[in-house]
Amino acid sequence: MKQVKDAMSALNAMVGPTHTLRQASEKMIQHKTGAAVVMDHDLPGPCVITERDLLKALAAGMDVDAEMVGDHMTGSLITAAPEWPLQTAADQMVRHGIRHVLVFEGPELVGILSMRDVIRVGGLAADARADAA
């Protein structure tokens, strides 16, 4: 059975809350990801800014060169552990209507898992068939 660690991505796209939305989008494009992790010593924990957050700001006519990530990021996150079954993490994503979860090993942030990662490694349907056999 595949685990979260088999599909998760490294923490490449990282920004701070004072980065602009344009800077966040450039970082996400550079790393070919749909989300950037937001880190800052003043935050209680890591947050995320996603493609959806950027699209909402654009649709509202906001200036991506003036708007700060901190005003658009998501702070209440669903998290996973590297050893979780991939199916469990995917189920949580569907249940909560999200496409990204942060992966923690104990207190340490070790990666990010996206629905794109789940699809990339595939095998969920194959895992379900194997479990049923």
Say what each PLM segment does.
Residues 37, 102, 114:
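Conserved beta-strand segments that form the floor/walls of ligand-binding pockets within enzyme
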Residues 42-43, 107:
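Glycine-biased flexible loop/turn sites that connect beta-strands or occur in inter-domain linkers
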Residues 15-32, 38-39, 80-97, 104, ...:
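The conserved cystathionine-beta-synthase
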Residues 33, 45-46:
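Local beta-strand N-terminus motif with an aromatic residue
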Residues 39-41, 51-52:
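Acidic/polar N-terminal loop/beta-strand segments that form early-domain functional surfaces
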Residues 14, 102, 111:
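Conserved SAM-binding loop
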Residues 1-11, 46-79, 85-94, 109, ...:
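Tandem CBS (Bateman) regulatory domains
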